[in-house]
Amino acid sequence: MEEGPIKKKLKSAGQGSGKTDAFRNFEQFFFRLNTLYTFLICRKHVVPTFKTLCGPIETALKRTVTKEDLAMVMALMPRECVFKYIDENQIYTETKIFDFNNGGFQQKENDIFELKDVDDQNQTQKSTQLLIFEFIDGTMQRSWSASDRFSQIKIPTYTTEEMKKMISKREALFKSRLREFILEKEKANLDPFSELTNLAQKYIPRERDYEDPIEAMMKAKQESNEMSIPNYSNNSVITTIPQMIEKLKSTEFYASQIKHCFTIPSRTAKYKGLCFELAPEVYQGMEHENFYSHQADAINSLHQGENVIITTSTSSGKSLIYQLAAIDLLLKDPESTFMYIFPTKALAQDQKRAFKVILSKIPELKNAVVDTYDGDTEPEERAYIRKNARVIFTNPDMIHTSILPNHANWRHFLYHLKLVVVDELHIYKGLFGSHVALVMRRLLRLCHCFYENSGLQFISCSATLKSPVQHMKDMFGINEVTLIHEDGSPTGAKHLVVWNPPILPQHERKRENFIRESAKILVQLILNNVRTIAFCYVRRVCELLMKEVRNIFIETGREDLVTEVMSYRGGYSASDRRKIEREMFHGNLKAVISTNALELGIDIGGLDAVLMCGFPLSMANFHQQSGRAGRRNNDSLTLVVASDSPVDQHYVAHPESLLEVNNFESYQDLVLDFNNILILEGHIQCAAFELPINFERDKQYFTESHLRKICVERLHHNQDGYHASNRFLPWPSKCVSLRGGEEDQFAVVDITNGRNIIIEEIEASRTSFTLYDGGIFIHQGYPYLVKEFNPDERYAKVQRVDVDWVTNQRDFTDVDPQEIELIRSLRNSDVPVYFGKIKTTIIVFGFFKVDKYKRIIDAIETHNPPVIINSKGLWIDMPKYALEICQKKQLNVAGAIHGAQHAIMGMLPRFIVAGVDEIQTECKAPEKEFAERQTKRKRPARLIFYDSKGGKYGSGLCVKAFEHIDDIIESSLRRIEECPCSDGCPDCVAASFCKENSLVLSKPGAQVVLHCILGHSEDSFIDLIKDGPEPNMPEIKVETVIPVSEHVNFSDDFKIIDVRRATKDDTHTNEIIKKEI
């Protein structure tokens, strides 16, 4: 048989040197590899691991097969092969049984909806990485991912002839590449075999080290500094914002997603002089001696002894106002002290750093003690600060629990206290705001009445307050406040882009995933050196966006940029957050992905762009986030990527509302509640402990009528006044939580490579949705497999894995009344309204594994105990004739109830003081309501609301809603009917706070529900109601809501309020009458 050209070439290449034999052996190895691989893939459908391939080849060749052998094949055919480590959790290693009667190995058919017990599953989910080799040359393309396991397309079984053709085609390509390589190296007078073995070294895969992401970031930055690489690599190429917008339009993924693009013109600076002379030394700490007009106005007002509220835009230099005011007084009065109050420790640390930078430039103040006083301050440091501090940076919690009850140790500080600064005043709202306002009144009372310090002034800042003067008066219990709102700071042009992901092919409603769209945009911004902060409205979106960005960098060969972007949110350890803040501040990160944790004014350096992954919770949040960009007076970009929720799509349709930068009316009223007895009593008890209460003296600090009633009924009296009750002793402030009760924290422990470090802390209420055995927990965009969840010891152990699927919990939440304490009728209706004990039951019964295309690839069962939360709330059972009208009109009942609940919750702030998360309801999930199959879990036709804070006794908010329910429902109905939208929007029945994205909504159904509850006759409104089915929802095939039938028990001391007569269509009132008799 005549020798082929390749064999002739091999002979001439290394006759007598052994090289010919080496290449011949290499050829034989490839033949065996090619044949075995094709057979395994086409007939056995098994994973081609290194171990699986080695055994048969070693038997045939009678030699050891090494990684270098496969790496040499990779070196010749880099585009046709894959040789890498993959995580065992990424693939499915199916157990096979050999059966001669049925043709060999048998593989089990998989049903993705068959629940597998997680305990059994975890026995096979080890963290080992598998080394695989595969051909991806188009002959038999395959990608080993979890989705293969459930592919709906059966992998074909090839005939022997077809397999031979595959083998021959691949071998021909191999020989061609080998021949070309030998010729090229010989032409260069190089040894071909040595060159091939050397080249193969770079193709030998190495197991992933799974380094901690924060450590990886710090290591990369350190190496960059050591190599003297500027942090702003390629920064010489500056992309302007208009250029960046055009570049986005020219990307391959652009398909007319930009629906609106607005430009707010730049603004020049306005300067103004002071009406008095600052201490000359003050100017040593300033970069320039000119003041913006609003800075001068505020400093002048403070000099005249006024209380000041500043509402100019974000990054307009508000901080400098109170910094300079304090420094001037420090220089003029050596005894003066100052208190800076911030809502978070991070913000306090940030402001202390900025303040110290100014002080460091003023020699006369270099010895002034300026420090933070918070929960992290060590005991020995606290004593020193109490005795020596001139300026403290603290938070409301420390004032409440440490400074006020312990005020004797703060005698000197409080006696000389000149200025109290409360930044980010808009944070103090709802229950928390009411608590903090009472703390401020206790502080003012002590300074006035005990330390005779009548010169105390207050200064506050916020860019997003609806009624700033009134809010500040309420917060501090003061009568006069000066408003500074004319902004004199310069700004560059601000560009606002509204981006709507494209509708997917063959879908009428479903759009491209907004997280993936946001990731593509963020990558482009980073590549063009546009320093960006991306805001996400919840933690999970933050992590998923981080994951997508990392994947894009890896897929596009830009692994060098992986450490240039980090995520930042609550739950991360304090040390990790400080490291990320520091790197961002010094310009070492090109982007940061955050929840609203960075919405506050923490200085993280100059930013060019804000990317919003989904619309924020409120218009105030939108303006706070948008204001983070453009801090160097350059042009800035705000780019909003809309999700498919009705709220986001509303702003896509009506973007003009986003331009109302200074329209205070678009912000929520932040009214404070001083009539909530539950809140008020706690602070009066604390105040009595700090200084005995005297009615005439103290009525200016607390509501007079409530003060007298609480003192007489709940406090002890002697000749000195009223003292705290024994129930609150020995330390009343410990009995009063400003934040509605702190939850237990669960530690997330990373056990990868024996690391055993806590990477996050998670609230107990979140664990059911984030930590379950076998689930994927995402941290810094990397997936971690939950190996152990211990609810008793409050920890979870997680291990880093490399998979491209995530897990979505399968859960349900039932909110049900347990006991009736109060019952009343409406003014013009027989429908009863109930108030009493509420039980919320959260059950996670399993989870889906979901690939990056949102396809379900597995279903796993879990056995977590239910989470039960007891609270207080109110509920209204939907009248039966409302159900009948909805059915007659073909309206979805679940959507009707859901829409009515949203409308009522949206109206609550007009009648009671409640934040968006302080009263909650049972939201309707699209997975259930839009299901194809009938569900056994039917829910009663009921509107229900409950206090989310205050524990089993509630916060007192729902009982106030109960008192005002007539006006609330009437106003809710009026708002729906006056709203011009067709299917629901944030102004009527859609809600940004909805946990289910407001997808199950029926605006006309909500009208029916509220009309019927208010007792309106069908004839009076039926013609105004649009017929269904609703165009904003898919075809509804199952009914999930049934009339209320279960009986709710009455409490032993229940009360009937304003009962008019028996209801027409149920037996509730009969039960009431029996109970009353």
Curated annotation (Swiss-Prot):
This is ATP-dependent helicase HRQ1. Belongs to the helicase family. HRQ1 subfamily. It catalyses: Couples ATP hydrolysis with the unwinding of duplex DNA by translocating in the 3'-5' direction; ATP + H2O = ADP + phosphate + H(+). GO terms for cellular component: nucleus. SUPFAM superfamilies: P-loop containing nucleoside triphosphate hydrolases. Residues 521-678 form the Helicase C-terminal domain. The keyword Nucleus applies.
